[in-house]
C-alpha cells in the first residue's frame, strides 16, 4: 500500500484550479466563436474560435487525470465506504445544489431569450425530460461523471490495490510510446462503440443522461485511472512532470488534426469518431505538457494561489449562468468581439468573486457548494474573556 505524501503537491492543486477557471474564457469565447451556442455574437471571431478549440481539445482530459490522482490518494487514506461517501458528497452535493439555484434559473432565462416559452407545452413528455436533462445538468456534467467514476472505482481501485500487493511495483516500467499506443487503441475502441450505437439505435446518442453517464464516463475513465496509476508509480508521474519535446510536438500536430476535423468533418460521417481518437491521444500528450509546465512554475505555496484553488469550484459553478446572461443582454451592445470578450471576463469573474465572498459568510451555502461539513475550531467554542 502506498503511503500518502506528507507534503501537498501544490502544482497539481494549481493546475486543477486553473483548468477549472479556464472554463470561464472557454464559455465566453464560445459566444464569439463560429460554434453555435445558446447565445452568439453577430459576427464570429476566427482567433477566439481558435482559442476556444484549443481549450476544449485537452482541458477535461488533464482535469480527470488530476482527479484520479487525488481520488486514489484519498482511497488509501480512508476505509472503502467512507472514501466513497466523502468523494460522492464533495461532488454530488454541489451538483445537486447548483441545479435549483443556478441551472434551473439559467434554463428559464434561456427559454425567454430564445423565445421557446410558447412551444414548451407542446413538447412530448420525453422531449421535456430530455431537454431538462441537458439543460439542468449543463456545465455540471463533470460532477455527475465523477460520481459515476467514484462508484465504478470502488471495484477498480480494489483490484488495483490487490494486484499491487501480489506484484513488485518497482519493476513496472512506462514509456510515452507505450502509453500513446494504449490510448490510441482506447480512442479507436471508443469510436467503434459510438459508431456501433449510431448504427443500431442513433436516438440514444441525443439522450442527455445516456450521454453524461455512459459516453462521457466511458471516454474519460482511462484518464481518471491514469491519474491513479501516476500516484502509485513515481516513474509514471516523473514521465509526466519531465518536459518532453516529443510530447509537445505530437500535441501540436494532434491539435492541427483536431482543427482540420472540425473544419472539414461532418457529423453525418465520421467527425465525432475521428475527434474521439484525436482527443484521446492529444489529452495524453497534453498531460505531459501541462504537468511539466506546472511542476516548473506552479509548485509553490502562495496565499493568492490558495485562495483561487479554494474558490475555483464555486467560481466555475456560478460562471455559466453569468456568462449566458452577459451573452444574452450585454453582448449585443458591444460591437467589438475582443472588447466584448474582455468585458465578459471582467463581468463574470468580478461578480463570481463577490458571490464567492458572500457565500463564505453563510455556513449553509458554504457547505452546499463545497460538500464539506463546516468544522468548528476549539477556539471558537471557548468563552470570550
UniProtKB/Swiss-Prot annotation:
Its EC number is 2.1.-.-. It is an enzyme of class 2 (transferase). It is found in: Cell membrane. Pfam families: Acyl_transf_3. Pathway: Glycan metabolism; osmoregulated periplasmic glucan (OPG) biosynthesis. InterPro entries: Acyl_transf_3_dom (IPR002656), Glucan_succinyl_AcylTrfase (IPR050623), Glucans_biosynth_C (IPR023723). Disulfide bonds: none annotated. It comes from the Bacteria. One of its GO terms (molecular function) is acyltransferase activity, transferring groups other than amino-acyl groups. The chain crosses the membrane at residues 17-37, 60-80, 91-111, 137-157, 173-193, 212-232, 239-259, 274-294, 311-331, 338-358. GO terms for cellular component: plasma membrane. One of its GO terms (biological process) is glucan biosynthetic process. HAMAP family: MdoC_OpgC. NCBIfam families: PRK03854.1 (NF003014). This is Glucans biosynthesis protein C. The gene is mdoC.
Amino acid at each position: 500500500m502506498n503511503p500518502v505524501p506528507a507534503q501537498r503537491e501544490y502544482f497539481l492543486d494549481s493546475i486543477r484550479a486553473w483548468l477549472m477557471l479556464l472554463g470561464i474564457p472557454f464559455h465566453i469565447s464560445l459566444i464569439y466563436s463560429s460554434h453555435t451556442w445558446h447565445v452568439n455574437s453577430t459576427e464570429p471571431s476566427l482567433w477566439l474560435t481558435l482559442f476556444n478549440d484549443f481549450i476544449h481539445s485537452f482541458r477535461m482530459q488533464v482535469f480527470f487525470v488530476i482527479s484520479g490522482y487525488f481520488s486514489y490518494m484519498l482511497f488509501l487514506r480512508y476505509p472503502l465506504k467512507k472514501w466513497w461517501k466523502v468523494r460522492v458528497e464533495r461532488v454530488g452535493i454541489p451538483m445537486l445544489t447548483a441545479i435549483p439555484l443556478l441551472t434551473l434559473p439559467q434554463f428559464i432565462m434561456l427559454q425567454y431569450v430564445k423565445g421557446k416559452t410558447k412551444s414548451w407545452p407542446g413538447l412530448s413528455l420525453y422531449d421535456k425530460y430530455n431537454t431538462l436533462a441537458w439543460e439542468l445538468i449543463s456545465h455540471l456534467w463533470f460532477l455527475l461523471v465523477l460520481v459515476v467514476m467514484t462508484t465504478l472505482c470502488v471495484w477498480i481501485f480494489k483490484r488495483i490495490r490487490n494486484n499491487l500487493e501480489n506484484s513488485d511495483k518497482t519493476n513496472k516500467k512506462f514509456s510515452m510510446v507505450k502509453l500513446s499506443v494504449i490510448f490510441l487503441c482506447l480512442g479507436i475502441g471508443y469510436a467503434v462503440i459510438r459508431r456501433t450505437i449510431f448504427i443500431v439505435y442513433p436516438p440514444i446518442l441525443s439522450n442527455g443522461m445516456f450521454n453524461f453517464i455512459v459516453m462521457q464516463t466511458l471516454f474519460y475513465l482511462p484518464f481518471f485511472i491514469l491519474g491513479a496509476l501516476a500516484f502509485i508509480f513515481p516513474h509514471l508521474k516523473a514521465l509526466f512532470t519531465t518536459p518532453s519535446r516529443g510530447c509537445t510536438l505530437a500535441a501540436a500536430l494532434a491539435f492541427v488534426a483536431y482543427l482540420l476535423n472540425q473544419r472539414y468533418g461532418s457529423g453525418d460521417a465520421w467527425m465525432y469518431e475521428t475527434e474521439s481518437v484525436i482527443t484521446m491521444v492529444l489529452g495524453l500528450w497534453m498531460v505531459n505538457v501541462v504537468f511539466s509546465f506546472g511542476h516548473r512554475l506552479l509548485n509553490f505555496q502562495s496565499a493568492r494561489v490558495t485562495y483561487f484553488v479554494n474558490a475555483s469550484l464555486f467560481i466555475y459553478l456560478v460562471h455559466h449562468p453569468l456568462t449566458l446572461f452577459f451573452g444574452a443582454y450585454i453582448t449585443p451592445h458591444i460591437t467589438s468581439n475582443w472588447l466584448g470578450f474582455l468585458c465578459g471576463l471582467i463581468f463574470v469573474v468580478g461578480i463570481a468573486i463577490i458571490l464567492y465572498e458572500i457565500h463564505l459568510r453563510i455556513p449553509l451555502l458554504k457547505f452546499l457548494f463545497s460538500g464539506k461539513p463546516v468544522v468548528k475550531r476549539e477556539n471558537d467554542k471557548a468563552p470570550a474573556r
